[in-house]
Amino acid sequence: MLRKVFIILLISLSFVSCEFILDTEFASSYLNYTIIDAPSEVAQRAFKFAQLYEQEDTVYVWGGQEPLRKAIGIDCSGLVVMCYKYAMVDTVYELLSSDMTAQNIYDRASRRISVSNARKGDLIFIGTEGSNAVTHIGLFEKYENNKVYFIDSSEGKNGVHYSEYQVDNKKIKGYGRMRVKY
């Protein structure tokens, strides 16, 4: 009888475990960390690392997440992930995941903010005009004269570079603040 109860319990846990992991707010209440917005100093440091990738003429490689010293190639989400990883070295903060797509970061690892509240190192989410899907991401620099300035990595410009869009560009899907473990 006890064996049957144990098997039923294991089966029940397997059904709820996937949902448990997807709900980060719920999960953090049971784990030994809290999920918070990345502090301003972390976001600013992340942006400085993006500038280093740009200065090193890092090329675009789809799926790339190369460390700065190696700098073979990096894609847009890899740039964001690596810059935030570097920015959190010797701090009490950690990324929610070490491998995320632009859409994953939009859905699960950031909090929506307005462009007027965006600070250096926050995130800009980009996609195809007419679609809600997020297919590209960059690190926000500033909003000035109706333009948004950011650093990203794209195949079209072959690597990490400074970009700018008009603030009303339909490709912009939103702005976000990275969420981190604390």
Question: Model-derived features: where do they sit?
Answer:
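Sec-dependent N-terminal signal peptides
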Residues: K4-L13
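...with weaker cross-activation on analogous glycine-rich loops/strands in unrelated enzymes
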Residues: T24-E25, I35-F47, V89-Y162
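Low-complexity, Gly/Ser/Thr/Pro-rich intrinsically disordered linker/tail segments
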Residues: K170-Y182
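Generic detection of short hydrophobic beta-strand segments and adjacent strand-loop junctions
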Residues: S163-V167
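N-terminal capping segments
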Residues: E19-E94
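Residues that form or immediately flank small-molecule/cofactor binding pockets and catalytic motifs
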Residues: Q65, E155, V180
